[in-house]
Regions:
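Short, flexible hinge/linker loops that cap or flank conserved catalytic cores
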Residues: 2-4, 133
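Active-site segments of SGNH/GDSL-like serine hydrolases
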Residues: 76-77, 110-158, 162-163
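Structural signal for conserved beta-strand scaffold positions within catalytic alpha/beta enzyme cores
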Residues: 38-40, 141, 169
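Soluble or luminal CAZymes and related metallo-dependent hydrolases
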Residues: 48-54, 98-109, 148-152, 209, ...
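Conserved SGNH/GDSL esterase-like catalytic core that processes O-acyl groups on lipids
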Residues: 6-12, 17-104
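Short, well-ordered alpha-helices that flank and scaffold nucleotide-derived cofactor binding pockets
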Residues: 26, 30, 115, 195, ...
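Catalytic His-Asp segment of secreted/periplasmic serine-dependent ester chemistry enzymes
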Residues: 144-221
C-alpha cells in the first residue's frame, strides 16, 4: 500500500530499542496499514530528542501536519516523572538539555509537541489553519520491553496518568516476568531473547532484544 493511501501516520522517537534495525515499530505499522516515520537513533536519550525538537529537526512542519500519533520510547532506567523538578512554561528550560534530568527533558518534549500542534491553527499553510486549538496532540508512551527496569516503568506509568496519555505496556504483555526464573536455565527469561545483558540490582537481565522482523520478541512487541 502506498503512503498516499495509508490513513494513519505514526512518528516514533527513541534510541537503540526503537531504531529501524529492531523491527517491532515497522511490523506494527504494517499491521495497522499505517505510514511509519522512525526517528529513533541508537545511543540517544530523551535529552537528545528535546534538543532536536528545540532545533526544529525532529520533524518538519509538513510532517507535523500529517502525524496522527507521536510515540515516545525512551526507556533508560531513570525517573521520568519527578514533578518537583519541572517548569510550568517549557520555554523556561535551559537549552541545550544534558542527561542530568530525564523528567525535565520528557516534560519539554511533551509540552513542545502539544504547543507545536496548537500553533498550527495560526499557520496558513496547515490543514489545521483556523481550527480552534489547532491539531489534537496524540502522544503514546511506552514501558521498557520487559519489567526489570522498575524505576523507569513505574515513573512512566505516573507520567501517563498525569497527562492522560495511552501507554504501551510491553512489560505486562511480553510473556514473561522478572519475578520467575526460567525453569531450565534458572536465569531470567529475558536473557533468551536478547543480544546482550545488563545487571540491575545484582541480577542479570536481557538488555537489547534480538533484532530483525523475523525475531520472536520483535513480533511479540
Amino acid at each position: 500500500m502506498s503512503d498516499e493511501k495509508k490513513k494513519l501516520t505514526v512518528l516514533l522517537s527513541g534510541a537503540s530499542f526503537a531504531s529501524v534495525d529492531n523491527g517491532w515499530f515497522e511490523l506494527g505499522c504494517e499491521a495497522l496499514r499505517a505510514k511509519g516515520i522512525n526517528r529513533a537513533i541508537g545511543g540517544e536519550a530523551i535529552a537528545d530528542v528535546a534538543n532536536r525538537m528545540s532545533r526544529g529537526d525532529l520533524y518538519s512542519r509538513e510532517e507535523l501536519d500529517e502525524v496522527d500519533v507521536f510515540v515516545i520510547m525512551q526507556v533508560h532506567n531513570r525517573d521520568v516523572y519527578a514533578p518537583n523538578e519541572l517548569k510550568k512554561d517549557y520555554h523556561e528550560y535551559a537549552l541545550p538539555f544534558t542527561r542530568g534530568n530525564y523528567a525535565a527533558a520528557f516534560d519539554y518534549v511533551i509540552k513542545k509537541y502539544i504547543s507545536d500542534c496548537y500553533q498550527l491553527q495560526f499557520d496558513k499553510g496547515s490543514k489545521y489553519y483556523g481550527v480552534k486549538g489547532g491539531k489534537p496532540a496524540v502522544i503514546l508512551l511506552c514501558t521498557h520491553w520487559h519489567d526489570a527496569r522498575v524505576v523507569y516503568n513505574e515513573s512512566i506509568r505516573k507520567l501517563s496518568d498525569k497527562w492522560g496519555f495511552p501507554l504501551v505496556k510491553f512489560d505486562e504483555q511480553i510473556g514473561f516476568s522478572k519475578t520467575v526464573e526460567h525453569p531450565e536455565t534458572h536465569r531470567q527469561t529475558s536473557t533468551l531473547f536478547a543480544d546482550d545483558t545488563e545487571c540491575i540490582d545484582g541480577v542479570e537481565y536481557g538488555w537489547h532484544p534480538n533484532r530483525g522482523k523475523d525475531c520472536y520478541i520483535q513480533n511479540r512487541m
